[in-house]
């Protein structure tokens, strides 16, 4: 059952949060990728593109694990376990929003001609890790 994300976790994800995303390939082996993180309500989100391994893996097996370290307190980190869904809706605007946050660019500058952007939306089942001062996230 999905959990409600604490305010402190949402703040972490709204900062320049880099996530290490684990998906599982067709052989069940983990694939690890670093991405720019975001949050929408109680869903943890990131952006990717069609043709990459992440969306292919997630369409076949929606299990996902994401680790995010707090840039302001390196001992603090959150680990999200959940199920992901991949959608095109709003993905172009989303990557531009992230480009503004991470690159201070109005438009994502690395878009390739014909590239189809995707948002991965994670329904979080469990949050691990430690918040600031080694306290649980709350």
Which positions does each model-derived feature cover?
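Charged, gly/pro-rich active-site loop segments
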Residues: 2-4, 76-138
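Short secondary-structure boundary segments
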Residues: 49, 70-71, 124-125
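Short, surface-exposed beta-strand-loop junctions and turns on beta-sheet-rich folds
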Residues: 52-54, 73, 136-137
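Short beta-strand segments
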Residues: 17-50, 56-58, 64-68, 77-79
